[in-house]
Amino acid sequence: MLERTYIEDVTPDDDGEDTTIAGHVHELRDLGGILFVIVRDATGRLQVVAKEDDTPDLFETAEGLSSEDVVQVTGTLEASDQAPGGVELAPTELTVVSEATDVPSIEISKDVDADLSTRLDERHLDVRKPSTKAVFSLRSKAMGAMTDWFYDNRFEEVDTPELSTAGAEGGADLFPVVYYDKEAYLSQSPQLYKQILVASGVDRLFEVGHAFRAEDFGTSRHVSEIAMFDVELGYVEDHHDVMDVQEESLRHTIRHVVEHAQRELDELGSDLSVPEADFPRITFEEAREILADEYDHVPEDDNDLDTKGERLLGEYFEEQGHPAVFVVGYPDEKFYYRQDVDGDDVASRKFDLLYRGQELSSGGQREHDIERLTAKMREQGVEPENFEFYLDAFRYGVPPHGGYGLGIDRLIQQLAGLDNIKEAILFPRDPDRLEP
């Protein structure tokens, strides 16, 4: 390994210390006899000050540098009020590790916006921009914190197939794949496998994986390949137990980001605070009443909210100090595995979590009685015979259970304050993009 200190670990308190850094040449400024070289690594930027009178050979090497060359620099740290971050490096050794042979097609060192399509085409360059790199550093810290919360609370991580003979949610938005001599599809959701595992005795589980939706869309909220954080737990009394888990884990995640990713938040200009108060839990009917009474907005679909409705509900509750809100009791007409509310022919124990005006997750209590489950499948036009691998798990005693699937990409979009979900994904996939 090349000897180096990460730039984020360098502080003015290190004045007088010798150190070595390595990274890309972010910016060059020649003042005649003094050359300022801003070096950028994965954690930050540090100013290197080369002086012709002090180190003529090194200065000559520095004069030959180009933007994005990879360098290794050894020298003495000097505290300076004029330097970015209050400290700079007086170099004694400068090695060019790798030369940049082409001029980058994207401006990396300056705050100049390229259109999103160009940024995604040149993602290997775009990720070098500090603002883009901050998104994925934040994402890494957020998902590490969320995963840790589930490990600490006795959940087990599982892996389920991303190839299957049928989709958990049915419909036409499945990607068919060639699988030997059989018909197969990319996974819409690990839902059926999560329930099979709960029935098998793995009663607190989570999975970080991908789901695929063959939908033709053109919005800032959708992509074809989705990163998901799926959760399922057994022995629940009702869907509120599931919401409790999601609320506590999300609050922990946001707190970790606020405490450990402030550099990234500052780079992104995202003003993030921890939602300490309980997340409000309102019924689906109450949500529609708020939209009608406060905003004169009525979603066209009587059984769902629309994008505008979610945004308006976000504004309504953020004004009251609640960036997150659960909407509970959606009409039960789409998914056979969701449990109905006793004595109510319409509502289900389904919920959505809205955060900063966007749906992050859907979840609820599942149906664990095989007779009711089979009847609901037939009511919704699903042939139970095609899901025998799933139904067989319910013949041997299944605890009441529930869970949810959280869209990781949407969560990062909201934490980072991004306009488009594709900005939160390293290599997004949509109907028009299959590379890089």
Curated annotation (Swiss-Prot):
Top-level lineage group: Archaea
Location of region: Aspartate: 191-194
Note: The misacylated aspartate-tRNA(Asn) is not used in protein synthesis until it is converted by GatCAB into asparaginyl-tRNA(Asn).
Cofactor note: Binds 3 Mg(2+) cations per subunit. The strongest magnesium site (Mg1) is bound to the beta- and gamma-phosphates of ATP and four water molecules complete its coordination sphere.
Family classification: Belongs to the class-II aminoacyl-tRNA synthetase family. Type 2 subfamily.
Biological processes, Gene Ontology terms: aspartyl-tRNA aminoacylation
Subunit and partners: Homodimer.
Organism, scientific name: Halobacterium salinarum (strain ATCC 700922 / JCM 11081 / NRC-1) (Halobacterium halobium)
CDD domains: ND_PkAspRS_like_N
InterPro entries per record: Aa-tRNA-synt_II, aa-tRNA-synth_II, aa-tRNA-synth_II/BPL/LPL, Asp-tRNA_synthase_2, Asp/Asn-tRNA-synth_IIb, NA-bd_OB-fold, NA-bd_OB_tRNA
General function of this protein: Aspartyl-tRNA synthetase with relaxed tRNA specificity since it is able to aspartylate not only its cognate tRNA(Asp) but also tRNA(Asn). This indicates that it is not able to differentiate between base C36 in the tRNA(Asp) anticodon (GUC) from base U36 in the tRNA(Asn) (anticodon GUU). Reaction proceeds in two steps: L-aspartate is first activated by ATP to form Asp-AMP and then transferred to the acceptor end of tRNA(Asp/Asn).
Binding site for Mg(2+) 2: E359, S362
HAMAP family found in the cross-reference section: Asp_tRNA_synth_type2 (MF_02075)
Entry keyword Aminoacyl-tRNA synthetase: yes
Stated name of the protein: Aspartate--tRNA(Asp/Asn) ligase
